[in-house]
């Protein structure tokens, strides 16, 4: 289904104060959803502001993977009460995964009755319509669609960067890991047509983009449900042929579905970067089974070794959960051993967070918080040691770096990433931004590298 751009153009902003503010919680999928909300609003004549207090429209795009993200939303909603009283015309919208949970939207309206619009993950393209109704009819809107809908193509998008951007290739997840709420709030797997993906990337290239990150809850499932017989490896090869594109990244890969064909595509496609996000979650076979992950510790390690054999410069990042119900000290030790053996270059480590309506929430032997935190600290120490070693090994080597802009920590330096994802800061002129340059690494820090441009 194609987005109705003509209808959007008929809903131009009438506010004197045409400013909007979007707060995004959660993953890269949410970030891209927010970029589309921003794209629609800008098409309507609104402008973005980073100052929430001056906005006439405020949107919270929510996440429900962990309880902490939900608590932040509640806190920020409460803080808007005075702003709404001061400016009754302020439009407050809440969307995203958190809203898809049973009873959540009604709870929000009960606790924060000044919220104007609530919608979920399947109907964000209708936000301009909701906004128009609030402004013209003065109604309060709550529309949560429980079942996944047809993919909508052609939604205007306002990407944060002019150099690199996210491109969603599929939506939803069919895996139902016992700790995870994503399949319940994002729906079943649906793949975009390859021609739609390729055309979007070609359009980005004409606008000057050098790098794309292909997004999906499990990119290795790409192709399911399409009439055309196509796999994720096939898609990588198609995207690799796009003239003018310099780099291709992707996430996330489920270890059980990452085939050798994908590994060979990464190896053979010159634009696909040597970086793989491969969530392991645990190193214990018993816990992996309880999580419904469908692989063992040995299978995961074997896969990592096969990948390294084919792609020597590859770096791995991962997700690890600490304190899953029933996790013993022995189980946790298996996770530490795996982290040491694989040696990750980045890791997103999480303390297990109970999620309503997931099987793990009902499991016995929930781990006390003090044990979770103690194990978490031990894991972070192991992971950080591995990251520091990887960075130290980079000293003296020359890497191709895509210059993304000025460093957030040192505005006198430029920043960018190597093909395998390492963050490099170095001195250079503004004219280098957006270009690929060779940088020699002269110093390794804990989580970044210092380099100098090769003349």
Curated annotation (Swiss-Prot):
Residues annotated to bind [4Fe-4S] cluster 2: 173, 177, 180
Taxonomic superkingdom: Bacteria
Keyword presence, Iron-sulfur: yes
Cofactor(s) needed for function: [4Fe-4S] cluster
Keyword Cell inner membrane belongs to the record: no
Residues involved in [4Fe-4S] cluster 1 binding: 27, 63, 97
Ranges where the MTTase N-terminal domain occurs: 18-136
Domain Radical SAM core: residue ranges: 159-389
The EC number(s) this enzyme carries: 2.8.4.3
GO cellular component, one term: cytosol
Alphabetized InterPro entries for the sequence: Elp3/MiaA/NifB-like_rSAM, Methylthiotransferase, Methylthiotransferase_CS, Methylthiotransferase_N, Methylthiotransferase_N_sf, MiaB_methiolase, rSAM, rSAM_horseshoe
Cofactor binding note of this UniProt entry: Binds 2 [4Fe-4S] clusters. One cluster is coordinated with 3 cysteines and an exchangeable S-adenosyl-L-methionine.
Keywords: 4Fe-4S, Cytoplasm, Iron, Iron-sulfur, Metal-binding, S-adenosyl-L-methionine, Transferase, tRNA processing
Reaction catalyzed: N(6)-dimethylallyladenosine(37) in tRNA + (sulfur carrier)-SH + AH2 + 2 S-adenosyl-L-methionine = 2-methylsulfanyl-N(6)-dimethylallyladenosine(37) in tRNA + (sulfur carrier)-H + 5'-deoxyadenosine + L-methionine + A + S-adenosyl-L-homocysteine + 2 H(+)
Disulfide bonds, paired cysteine numbers: none
GO molecular function, one term: metal ion binding
SMART domains (UniProt xref): Elp3
UniProt subcellular location: Cytoplasm
Span of domain TRAM: 392-455
Function: Catalyzes the methylthiolation of N6-(dimethylallyl)adenosine (i(6)A), leading to the formation of 2-methylthio-N6-(dimethylallyl)adenosine (ms(2)i(6)A) at position 37 in tRNAs that read codons beginning with uridine.
Protein family (similarity comment): Belongs to the methylthiotransferase family. MiaB subfamily.
Subunit structure of this chain's protein: Monomer.
Protein name: tRNA-2-methylthio-N(6)-dimethylallyladenosine synthase
Organism of provenance: Clostridium beijerinckii (strain ATCC 51743 / NCIMB 8052)
């Amino acid at each position: 289904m194609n987005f109705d751009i003509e209808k959007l153009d008929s809903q131009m902003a009438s506010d004197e104060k045409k400013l909007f503010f979007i707060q995004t919680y959660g993953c890269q999928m949410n970030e891209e959803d927010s970029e589309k909300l921003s794209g629609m609003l800008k098409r309507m004549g609104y402008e973005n502001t980073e100052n929430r207090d001056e906005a006439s429209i405020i949107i919270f795009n929510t996440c429900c993977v962990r309880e902490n993200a939900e608590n932040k939303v509640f806190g920020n909603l409460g803080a808007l009460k005075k702003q709404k009283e001061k400016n009754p015309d302020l439009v407050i919208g809440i969307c995203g995964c958190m809203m898809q949970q049973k009873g959540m939207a009604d709870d929000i309206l009960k606790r924060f009755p000044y919220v104007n619009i609530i919608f979920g993950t399947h109907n964000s393209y209708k936000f301009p319509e909701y906004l128009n109704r609030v402004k013209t009819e003065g109604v309060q809107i709550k529309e949560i669609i429980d079942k996944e809908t047809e993919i909508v193509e052609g939604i205007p998008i306002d990407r944060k960067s002019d150099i690199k951007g996210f491109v969603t290739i599929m939506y939803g997840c069919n895996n139902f890991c016992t700790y995870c709420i994503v399949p319940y709030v994002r729906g079943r797997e649906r793949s975009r047509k390859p021609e739609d993906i390729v055309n979007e990337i070609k359009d980005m290239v004409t606008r000057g983009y050098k790098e794309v990150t292909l997004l999906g809850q499990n990119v290795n499932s790409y192709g399911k449900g399409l009439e055309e017989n196509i796999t994720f490896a096939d898609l990588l090869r198609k995207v690799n042929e796009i003239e003018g594109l310099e780099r291709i990244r992707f996430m996330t890969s489920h270890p059980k579905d990452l085939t050798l064909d994908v590994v060979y595509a990464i190896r053979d496609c010159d634009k696909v970067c040597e970086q793989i996000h491969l969530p392991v979650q645990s190193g214990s076979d018993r816990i992996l089974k309880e999580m419904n992950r469908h692989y063992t510790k040995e299978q995961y390690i074997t896969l990592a070794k096969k990948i390294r054999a084919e792609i020597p410069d590859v770096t791995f990042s991962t997700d690890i959960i600490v304190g899953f119900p029933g996790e013993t000290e022995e189980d946790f030790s298996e996770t530490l051993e795996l982290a040491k053996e694989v040696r990750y270059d980045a890791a997103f480590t999480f303390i297990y967070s109970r999620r309503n309506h997931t099987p793990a929430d009902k499991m016995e032997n929930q781990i006390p918080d003090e044990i979770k935190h103690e194990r978490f600290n031990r894991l972070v120490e192991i992971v950080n040691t591995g990251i520091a070693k990887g960075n130290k090994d980079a000293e003296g080597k020359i890497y191709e770096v895509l210059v993304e802009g000025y460093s957030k920590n040192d505005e006198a330096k430029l920043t960018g990433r190597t093909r395998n994802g390492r963050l490099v800061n170095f001195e250079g002129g503004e004219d280098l931004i957006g270009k690929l340059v060779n940088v020699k690494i002269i110093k390794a820090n804990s989580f970044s590298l210092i380099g100098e441009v090769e003349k």
